[in-house]
Amino acid sequence: MDHLNLCRYLTESILTDLELTLIDENENTLVINVHKLILSINCQYFETLFSGQFIDSQKNNLKLLVPDIHVVRDIIYGFYKNPIKYKNYPDWLYELKKIVCQNFLCLETNIEILHNIIVPTNGFDKLLDTIDLIGYDSDTISLLVGNMPDNYDLTKLPIELIRQMFDVPMFNMIYVSDKDGTFKIGNGNISFNITSNTLINNGHFEFSSIHNKIIYHHVCDIYVYDLLNYTTNKFTNPISHTIKSIVLTPDQEYIIYDSSPQIISKFDFISMEIIESRFAPTGAVVNDIFSSTELGHFGKIEELQCCNPNLLIIGSNVLSFYNVNDMLLMNIIENNIIPNDLYGRIYSSSIKKGRIFVSLLNDIIFVLSSINMYFIKPDTYEYIKKIHCNNFYNHDYCATNNDFWDICNINQDVIAILVGNLLTIYNWKLDKTIIQIDICHTECNGSYCKIDKIVYDSTTKLLFVDCSNSRSGKKIYSILMDNIDLNIPINNVDFSIFSKNKIMRYGNPKCISGIKKFKIIDNYKSKLYNNIEKYLKNNQ
């Protein structure tokens, strides 16, 4: 039967043989005329009821006590290929009620939907009740941890459940979904939404665990999304120039951003005000265009926080690139921000047209250009060494294609270098290549592979490789560096050590449909984990 006709048989009560009265615990009622056959075919609960020797089996009028009359009505309408949704519940509550009702009717429940809803703090107990009903496993326990308020009263929970929650891997990745632009959190086993709507199109984003805020930019605007109350504040750059990149300061109190024409600004994302702006080439304060803003001072930044294509914070310094032949190191001191004459500007004929990739390890700056790799001391700006990049790229690959380049640190002596589809683990102090992995050959079955990013997570000791190809789409692989002796070069590489159990797709494929942008984090839910750890120690 055509589903439209089937739907009409329901809505117009054609040939119905059962008047079904749904009743909830508050004695609210809802009456629908249905067909026993349709209910029996689609639902084991009704099949058992109508085919058994129960008092109600042969009745034409039936009263049924259900968890929620509106949601059960929606489920029954779904049997007739006429999906409807009760509008008076927020999405998160509706989906939880739907799972409860599906469980009541002995229907298969779709736990995946829980990955995509945002449960507010006051709704956590409802989530807990729902999961308690459907059962605990690694997925549902991870969802509990991900949604639990940091200050939740742990005495409400069984001690064994708390132990299982403490064993859930820390959530170490925040990313933007390639499918719908929402932000998600993942820990390698599971991922779930932390925003319900699209927040970002292009540009960088930062995450402040202290303030529970996501900061991102698009064109001339900076957006601050509050994860606790689900609100967004917007700031527009006063000079109406595109914001090129943003960096969160290590104290997580400010954003430093750069915008054309060569202006670096310190921005308070709580008050949504610019603290100070300076013209990068001279260090001069730019205050005539901020007449309504009282200028303050830059605080001292103690350590590296982040590296972006245009901006790098190094201790108390900001390294900013405005073209490939001009690397300007800005020095942030207590009450000023000025170009440091000692550092000056580096002009090198070896740095050709194309992007420059920079990383920092303690007191060494690594600069990867299309020709050479430089090892620079930031205090004197001396070259410790300079090596040719010939060993870092596959000769079948054009080295000038700069979209395929990246660099990151593994430990004090070892860095990961990506050029094209060739990933090199390199001990720079020993000047030795530990291992080289051709991502195209090992992971993409010889098909064209585009590598977008490599990131190392020192907490989990995982090197993440973000790549995509025409066959399998976008993937993120994680390489466990513990499997490699970083002091001993591997001469005859056995790629079997990088088989699927060593380079694995990040997360559960059913949870992650695609990642547009991602950031490795180590502090999401850290307060909750600390509270759980203390509670377990006090209740041994």
Swiss-Prot record:
GO cellular component: membrane
Keywords: Membrane, Transmembrane, Transmembrane helix
Domain BTB: 16-88
Pfam family, one: BTB
Domain of life: Viruses
Locations listed in the record: Membrane
UniProt xrefs under InterPro entries: BTB/POZ_dom (IPR000210), SKP1/BTB/POZ_sf (IPR011333)
UniProt topology in membrane: Single-pass membrane protein
Family statement drawn from the similarity comment of this UniProt entry: Belongs to the mimivirus BTB/WD family.
Protein name as it appears in the record: Putative BTB/POZ domain-containing protein R224
